[in-house]
């Protein structure tokens, strides 16, 4: 087993104050603050609870396109859900000291259909759009079996419409696969960071892949502009979509049940710390929102970002009414964590997280590869680099000066022995074997050099 994670000299961390907890003591890291802006087209109150209308169980996709054999969906009755994995064997390697709680993994890297966390929000929005369109066209009545969406009449209607998205990769896979399965014309605008294998996977599905030389932000802007000019095009806007965000939030419904099955209590004496990789912010914000709605203030969520792409940290620390980019701080936005290579955060997500988010930390690319190998060795789970971002969180929270100060300020230090640390992994199922081997080789080389 590789040695445990070294001190946080390779990481940076900041913690946000919680409105329902003690005021931070002087001398702490500067609090990150985010504020809503009218530049977001959708708004959502952190005190409201507009959870998705239906439980987020997708029971029809496996019937829609028989080119795909969704065995995992057959085993789960058509549901798209990931397991909750006990990871005690990983605790020491990740620097989680004895007596500081138990470590678990929420394994969204293995979600069926899209192979990443993006299956949650992406497929939710595609199905919501399809259902809305079918009702409008008289093909579906309220309460009717949604399997009519797989019938030829529905596919004929859907074929006249396009579903488009801008993506660095995983959201594009989610939208492209779901939309094409239903019969929509699908277009994915992909940034320069996108991996070639993800583009090829989409092309094999008949999805139009539009390549852009610029970054994620430019790909999204180009896709949005093109869709606005076409009345038959629906654009899934990763920066502004409330439907997408609420699709992610539904994960909390299933996690609550999984925690109960494992006998994991979440209350004042048993805090739950959740560590989520963050790109533009929609997925981790949606999950955080859902968890806080269902489990209350004893859930403490932290976002993990690449050192060169900390767009959410930049936004939360920015003055009111501004929307800065990581480039404004002299950062490069270059990272092997392609799904997290975002220069500017979603204002919708940032506004929602201002009163809910507990903290943000940054991770070096080398650390992602080291943790990827540690996860593989301890659990056998194969993840991509961006999915490894959250694993630095438990050691930073319980072992760094900033983390310990925050725990004491919240009165949580005395509750650590009963705490649960949940690292949310985000992608990896469909990564080609050659890519996995490259990831592993780089990680092992780094660990050997550090030994």
Swiss-Prot record:
Reactions it catalyzes: D-serine = pyruvate + NH4(+)
GO BP, one annotated term: D-serine catabolic process
Positions of region (Disordered): 1-55
MF-aspect GO terms: D-serine ammonia-lyase activity; hydro-lyase activity; pyridoxal phosphate binding
EC number of this enzyme: 4.3.1.18
Glycosyltransferase is among the record's keywords: no
Cofactor(s) required, per the database record: pyridoxal 5'-phosphate
Modified residue annotations for N6-(pyridoxal phosphate)lysine: 118
Keywords: Lyase, Pyridoxal phosphate
Pfam families: PALP (PF00291)
Composition bias type Low complexity, residue spans: 22-35
InterPro entries the UniProt entry points to: D_Ser_am_lyase, Ser/Thr_Dehydratase, TrpB-like_PALP, TrpB-like_PALP_sf
Gene3D superfamilies recorded: 3.40.50.1100
Similarity field: Belongs to the serine/threonine dehydratase family. DsdA subfamily.
The name this protein goes by in its record: Probable D-serine dehydratase
Species name: Paracidovorax citrulli (strain AAC00-1)
């Amino acid at each position: 087993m590789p040695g445990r994670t070294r001190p946080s000299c390779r990481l940076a961390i900041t913690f946000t104050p919680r409105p329902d907890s003690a005021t931070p003591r002087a001398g702490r890291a500067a609090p990150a603050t985010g504020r809503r802006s009218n530049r977001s087209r959708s708004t959502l109150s952190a005190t409201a609870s507009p959870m998705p209308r239906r439980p987020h169980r997708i029971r029809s996709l496996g019937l829609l396109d028989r080119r795909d054999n969704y065995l995992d969906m057959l085993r789960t009755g058509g549901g798209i859900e990931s397991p909750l994995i006990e990871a005690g064997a990983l605790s020491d390697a990740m620097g989680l000291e004895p007596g500081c709680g138990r470590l678990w993994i929420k394994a969204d890297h293995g979600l069926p259909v899209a192979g990443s966390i993006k299956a949650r929000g992406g497929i939710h929005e595609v199905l919501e759009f399809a259902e809305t369109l079918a009702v409008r066209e008289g093909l579906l009545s309220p309460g009717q079996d949604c399997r009519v969406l797989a019938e030829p009449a529905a596919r004929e209607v859907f074929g006249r419409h396009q579903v488009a998205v801008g993506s660095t990769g995983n959201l594009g896979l989610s939208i492209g696969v779901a939309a094409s399965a239903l019969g929509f014309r699908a277009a994915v605008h992909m940034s320069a960071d996108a991996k070639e294998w993800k583009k090829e996977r989409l092309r094999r599905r008949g999805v139009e892949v539009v390549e852009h030389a610029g970054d994620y932000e430019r790909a999204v802007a180009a896709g949005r502009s093109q869709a606005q000019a076409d009345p038959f095009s629906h654009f899934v806007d990763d920066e502004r979509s409330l439907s997408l965000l609420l699709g992610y939030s539904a994960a909390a419904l299933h996690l609550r049940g999984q925690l109960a099955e494992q006998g994991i209590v979440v209350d004042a004496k048993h805090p739950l710390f959740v560590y989520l990789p963050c790109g533009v912010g929609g997925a981790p914000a949606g999950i955080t929102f859902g968890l806080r709605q269902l489990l209350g203030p004893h859930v403490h969520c932290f976002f993990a970002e690449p050192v060169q792409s900390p767009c959410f940290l930049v936004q939360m620390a920015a003055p009111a009414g501004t929307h800065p980019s990581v480039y404004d701080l002299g950062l490069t936005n270059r990272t092997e964590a392609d799904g997290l290579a975002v220069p500017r955060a979603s204002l919708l997500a940032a506004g929602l997280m201002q009163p809910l988010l507990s903290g943000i930390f940054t991770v070096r690319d080398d650390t992602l590869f080291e943790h990827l190998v540690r996860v593989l060795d301890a659990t056998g789970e194969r993840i991509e680099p961006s999915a490894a971002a959250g694993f630095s969180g438990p050691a930073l929270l319980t072992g760094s000066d900033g983390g310990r100060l925050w725990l004491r300020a919240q009165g949580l230090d005395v509750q650590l022995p009963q705490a649960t640390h949940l690292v949310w992994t985000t992608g990896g199922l469909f990564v080609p074997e050659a890519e996995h081997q490259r990831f592993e080789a780089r990680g092992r080389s780094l660990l050997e050099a550090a030994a």
